[in-house]
Amino acid sequence: MTLLILLRHGQSVWNQKNLFTGWVDIPLSQQGIQEALTAGEAIKNLPIDCIFTSTLVRSLMTALLAMTNHSSKKIPYIIHEERPDMSRIHSEKELEQMIPLFQSSALNERMYGELQGKNKQEVAEQFGEEQVRLWRRSYKIAPPQGESLFDTAQRTLPYFQKRIFPLIQQGKNIFISAHGNSLRSLIMDLEKLTEEEVLSLELPTGKPIVYEWTEQKFTKSALSFG
């Protein structure tokens, strides 16, 4: 059995302020830091061979904090794929104590366009709660100058299929720390959800969701905490 662990980053400073964040690179709040550490406690005894995050700092912070108390005692190290010489380790002994971490913008949050930096309640008052709900949760409706969930899936799913899924097929246990909508697009594919079903899919911050890869299919595990 091979595991795929999905984790939406801990609360960010802008989550705390109820602002649309998208691609704006905002760090975790104090609560988000604690959520990441708590998530780490939940998954500390699960095997992890490789980590993937987005290029946004809240995703990276969450992964690193979650791994601080992992039972393997292994240290995540960032692989700079554009400059592999930067992260080459020349000691086999040290390499055995490390877990590779890869970053990709394909896993970034959906880009919220003209909503980024705006207060969610104020936007709802301006455009109506139903319109904002469709922007945030529907599959193909995008906010002004932003991405829909469909647009987000056009980058997350090819990256998963090309870069991550082959590792799972090799028996590697994968930990992905990413964002609400990049993970929603992935879960929609893993669970074969319809466009209607994905409307109600909500992912809380800092709650691990675990899938088992067995018999050539993904099944949500009882180990999930979301």
UniProtKB/Swiss-Prot annotation:
Family note: Belongs to the phosphoglycerate mutase family. BPG-dependent PGAM subfamily.
Stated role: Catalyzes the interconversion of 2-phosphoglycerate and 3-phosphoglycerate.
Protein name: 2,3-bisphosphoglycerate-dependent phosphoglycerate mutase
Annotated positions binding substrate: 8-15, 21-22, 58, 109-112, 120, 136-137, 180-181
Recorded metabolic or biological pathway in which this protein acts: Carbohydrate degradation; glycolysis; pyruvate from D-glyceraldehyde 3-phosphate: step 3/5
Class in the EC hierarchy, top level: isomerase
Superkingdom as given in the UniProt entry: Bacteria
Keywords: Gluconeogenesis, Glycolysis, Isomerase
InterPro entries membership: His_Pase_superF_clade-1, His_PPase_superfam, PG/BPGM_mutase_AS, Phosphogly_mut1
GO biological process terms held by the UniProt record: gluconeogenesis; glycolytic process
Catalytic activity: (2R)-2-phosphoglycerate = (2R)-3-phosphoglycerate
SMART domains: PGAM
CDD domains: HP_PGM_like
Pfam families membership: His_Phos_1
EC numbers, comma separated: 5.4.2.11
Residues annotated as site: Transition state stabilizer: H179
GO molecular function, one term: phosphoglycerate mutase activity
Matching NCBIfam families: PRK01112.1
Gene name linked to the record: gpmA
Active site per database record: H9, E109
